[in-house]
UniProtKB/Swiss-Prot annotation:
Record GO cellular component, one term: cytosolic large ribosomal subunit
Keywords per UniProt: Chloroplast, Plastid, Ribonucleoprotein, Ribosomal protein
Species in which this protein is naturally found: Porphyra purpurea (Red seaweed)
Record localization: Plastid, Chloroplast
Domain of life (superkingdom): Eukaryota
Name this protein carries in UniProt: Large ribosomal subunit protein uL13c
One of the GO biological process terms: translation
Main location: plastid
Subunit structure of this chain's protein: Part of the 50S ribosomal subunit.
Record's keyword annotation contains Transferase: no
Any GO MF annotation of the entry: mRNA binding
InterPro entries, sorted: Ribosomal_uL13, Ribosomal_uL13_bac-type, Ribosomal_uL13_CS, Ribosomal_uL13_sf
Amino acid sequence: MNKTQVPSLITSQSWYVIDAKNQKLGRMSTHISNILRGKNKPSYTPYLDTGDYVIVINSSEVSVSGNKTTQKLYRRHSGQPGGLKVETFEQLQTRLPNRIVEKSVKGMLPKGPLGRKLFTKLKVYPGPSHPHAAQKPQEYMV
């Protein structure tokens, strides 16, 4: 069977920086997942990793609309009987601000081996600095 897309012709992967300060979580996560998948490129192929790397800074200052700061719940389970832990958006943002953006983007990626590979290309930092200056990332406006 002949393929119309030749995998060796895929362009190189670039790096983008997204500032999460005062950005809505869902809208920003949609842009991030599209970049990770490679849907912003003409060489997009659903079964290949054609996406770019994304660095998110200021993840501790991401916002949500409405009453989600007090009403949105994040659940995790330890595996033990009675081991369900529940946290609100506000509590999780003070404890682990990176986890909010990571969980939001991970839910928008494909489930399976390709999605796990794409998720490793997301780098999230709570402050304004990141250690990826050597990659010369481009500013991406959401």
